[in-house]
Amino acid sequence: MKNSNRFSYSRRKFSRHLFISATAMSAAPILLPGIAQAQSSTSLKIGIIGSGRIGGSVGLRWAEAGHEILFSSRNPDQLNDLVTQAGPKARAGYPQEAAEFGDIVFVAVPYAATPQVGRDYGALMQGKIVIDCGNPYIQRDGEMAAVALEKGTGVASAEFLPGVKLVRAFNALSWVEVNEEAHRDGELIAIPIAGDDQEAVAVATQLVIDAGFDPVIVGGLDKAGLFDQGTAVYVKGMTAREMRAELGL
């Protein structure tokens, strides 16, 4: 099937991306105890907090790649169709269950809810890799969005979610692109990634590949503002080559 061929192609590309990220971020090797094997063949347990359009769409792509997914909502019974579509390795639960379940936690909530996620589930996520894809919109999220955009969303999210291995990713493309452009023919759509923890960045890199996209490592969390909403690379459907050129990488 053509999707599996593209997936194999993306897997081959991962070693090149990981080498580049390790070289750029540190001269020391990246050691991924417990998760290193998952990057070759083992499925990861991923808890998704916020299973709406983007959380649900990305979760489906990860389920297709063989990962175990716990979609969550305050009304998990409403996620039955999503779980059925995702297959036998997926289930639904409450956000607390997702925070407990996941080796990786994907936070896909309206940005104004991010501080509450930290307050409610931060203790359960301590030391875990957390991928944050929320975007602050002033019209929807109010003054806190303006503050987050001024700081850069990576820096702001780190304040809301202390003690986790935070990565910013999956915020700079739409849920429509996730559904329609994953594993497409030719050059894949790029997804920018920013994070301070090398292990977390490496795992997020693999998860971008698993979802059917091309990872572009931009730098630490202080660089995540380069792909915040309103920037030149936000929801532009760029290839990795185009994105690197735009960002000067």
Regions from the language model: what does each represent?
Residues M1-M25:
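N-terminal secretory signal peptides and thylakoid transit peptides that target proteins
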Residues I30-A65, L70, R74-L79, K89, ...:
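C-terminal segment of N-terminal export signals and the immediately downstream linker at the start
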Residues N80, R119, V155-A156:
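Active-site phosphate/pyrophosphate- and oxyanion-stabilizing loops and adjacent acidic/basic residues
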Residues G87-K89, P95-I129, G134-R140:
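Rossmann-like NAD(P)-binding element
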Residues G93, F160-L166, R184-A224, D228-Q229, ...:
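Internal alpha-helical scaffold of NAD(P)-dependent oxidoreductase catalytic cores
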Residues G134-V167, A172, A182:
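Rossmann-fold NAD(P)-binding glycine/threonine-rich loop
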Residues S174-V178:
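Rossmann-like dinucleotide/flavin-binding elements
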